[in-house]
Amino acid sequence: YTLSLHDALPILPPEIIVGIIGVETRWGRVMGKTRILDALATLSFNYPRRAEYFSSELETFLLMARSEQDDPLDLKGSFAGAMGYGQFMPSSYRQYAVDFNGDGHINLWDPVDAIGSVANYFKQHGWVSGDLVAVQALGQAPGLNNGFKTKYSVSQLAAAGLTPTQPLGNHQQASLLRLDIGTGYQYWYGLPNFYTITRYNHSTHYAMAVWQLGLAVSQARMQ
């Protein structure tokens, strides 16, 4: 089921879905054993700073269980209340989850619905089909701020001493990504699709892990 459905998903390449589900749950092997009701109730009452957020998630979870005719006591996930293969929070379920297998239910613990829901999440966050994600840079730019929220013109990055290892297509701007590889830093041009991956988890290293894991799995399948 992991890849045969992707013909129906022209928006998002299979390797991104494989990367997301791989990083989140090791392809379904680690989806969490905490009762979601307990997790969200505990966080709602014991963490005042985020009580409003988790109370809203708890309400949405209970509405989800009712609409899907699930017993809320049976559903298990992460300590933070994230659910299923893609570790959706209840609010993400409400906004982005889809019934991809057409059985009349949205089930985030079903791999088919999970694949469709991850794809829809990316579609709604602006993924551009066929576009680049990131391009490695030659050179170092220690004087520039880095991170997926930065924005530089290609000429600014060139003036700082960076050169892309492949053409950037029509992109005239990029974020400057810096990865610690132990022996030093590796710089990358981050493009809009990379930023879209960070909408799933707001971390440069997370997004790079998702992308590179997906590519590695894709390449391994081709060998």
Where are these regions (language model features)?
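Short, small-residue-biased leader/transition segments that mark boundaries at the very start
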Residues: 2-9
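Solvent-exposed loop/turn segments at secondary-structure junctions
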Residues: 24-28, 82, 128, 140, ...
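Acidic, His- and aromatic-enriched active-site or binding-groove loops in soluble protein domains
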Residues: 37-65, 99-101
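Flexible, glycine-rich surface segments
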Residues: 72-182
